[in-house]
């Protein structure tokens, strides 16, 4: 005996009221065993219920003699968080002959009334606790007795099935005898109808043959057209293949050409980068020279401006002196003129006096 931890698995069924057939859940693992759940909604006039079964997954892949015991309980819930648990009072046995549990019965009316079909969705949580797992070669004496009793029960069920099958076969034989007698009577009546219908059938067969011949001719012509179209399509496909090959060759040639051009461009770019670096260096040198020349020119200009200022000052002073001399000369000339005029006036007066004396 070994107890495993309880495992829960939840799955949702959408549009539950519209489901009419068996619903399988995904496979899940509990107690190192693979399981799945079957939900079977049965709806008829006499009985309406939902059966939920726990199944062992892929029992045919297990070795003979396997056996498992597990507790199986259900929890129903809705989207609003309401829950109800359907516990398990017994421990179910799973083996080769019984790979599923006893069903849990759920009435759909109660599911609707208690609000477990909210938005027509049924949410089922399966709780499985594996109590015992027996592999082949691990059976004890007590377990062998239980297994043999279970196998005898299974064999008895199989024998009862064979008895039921034999009874069904006897009933079928009796039904066949009655059917044969009825068939003989019906066959006499049908023979007359068959004789009358035979001529009609022959005529219909002839018309059908004519139609078939016409259809065959039509089909042959269509087949020839289709074959011609297929030949054209094959020719077009071959042309397309040749064009694709040529295109690939051209693309390869273009790639080679582009690669060579790219190499040339890269070389040119490298040269251009080298030239640009040289130009930058030259520009820097020219800037330095220009700055040096500007400084030299500024110093020379300052010297020239100082010399010119000195010469201008000397020139101005000389001009000022000349202007003063010129003014003095003008004053002297004016004084000289005044004295000359005075002398002229005086000489005139003296002349008049002489004239008066001589007169």
Curated annotation (Swiss-Prot):
Coiled-coil residues: 146-337
InterPro entries reported in the protein's UniProt record: MATH-CC_domain_protein, MATH/TRAF_dom, TRAF-like
Pfam families: MATH_2
Keyword Coiled coil set for record: yes
Annotated ranges, domain MATH: 6-128
Top-rank taxon, per record: Eukaryota
Alphabetic keyword roster: Coiled coil
Record's keyword annotation contains Coiled coil: yes
Protein name: MATH domain and coiled-coil domain-containing protein At2g42475
Protein's organism: Arabidopsis thaliana (Mouse-ear cress)
Lineage of source species: Eukaryota, Viridiplantae, Streptophyta, Embryophyta, Tracheophyta
């Amino acid at each position: 005996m070994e107890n495993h931890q309880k495992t829960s698995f939840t799955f949702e069924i959408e549009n539950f009221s519209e489901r009419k057939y068996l619903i399988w859940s995904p496979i899940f693992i509990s107690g190192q065993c693979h399981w799945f759940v079957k939900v079977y909604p049965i709806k008829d006039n006499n009985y309406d219920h939902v059966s939920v079964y726990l199944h062992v997954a892929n029992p045919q892949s297990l070795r003979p003699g396997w056996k498992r015991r597990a507790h199986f309980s259900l929890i129903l819930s809705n989207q609003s968080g309401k829950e109800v648990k359907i516990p398990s009072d017994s421990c179910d046995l799973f083996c080769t002959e019984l790979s599923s549990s006893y069903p849990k019965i759920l009435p759909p009316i109660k599911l609707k009334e208690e609000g477990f079909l909210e938005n027509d969705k049924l949410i089922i949580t399966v709780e499985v606790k594996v109590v015992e797992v027996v592999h082949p070669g691990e059976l004890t004496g007590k377990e062998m007795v239980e297994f043999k009793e279970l196998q005898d029960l299974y064999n008895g069920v199989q024998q009862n099935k064979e008895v039921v099958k034999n009874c069904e076969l006897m009933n079928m034989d009796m039904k066949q005898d009655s059917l044969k007698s009825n068939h003989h009577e019906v066959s006499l009546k049908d023979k007359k109808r068959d004789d009358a219908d035979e001529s009609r059938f022959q005529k219909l067969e002839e018309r059908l043959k004519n139609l078939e011949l016409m259809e065959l001719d039509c089909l042959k012509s269509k087949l020839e057209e289709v074959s011609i179209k297929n030949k054209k399509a094959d020719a077009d496909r071959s042309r397309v293949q040749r064009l694709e090959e040529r295109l690939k060759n051209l693309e390869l040639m273009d790639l080679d050409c582009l690669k060579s051009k790219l190499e040339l461009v890269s070389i040119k770019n490298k040269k251009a980068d080298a030239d640009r670096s040289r130009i930058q260096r030259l520009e820097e040198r020219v800037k330095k020279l220009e700055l040096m020349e500007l400084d030299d020119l500024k110093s020379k200009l300052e010297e020239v401006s100082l010399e010119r200022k000195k010469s201008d000052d000397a020139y101005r002073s000389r001009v000022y002196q000349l202007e003063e001399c010129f003014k003095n000369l003008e004053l002297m000339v004016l004084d000289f003129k005044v004295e000359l005029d005075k002398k002229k006036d005086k000489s005139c007066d003296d002349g008049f006096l002489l004239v008066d004396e001589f007169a």
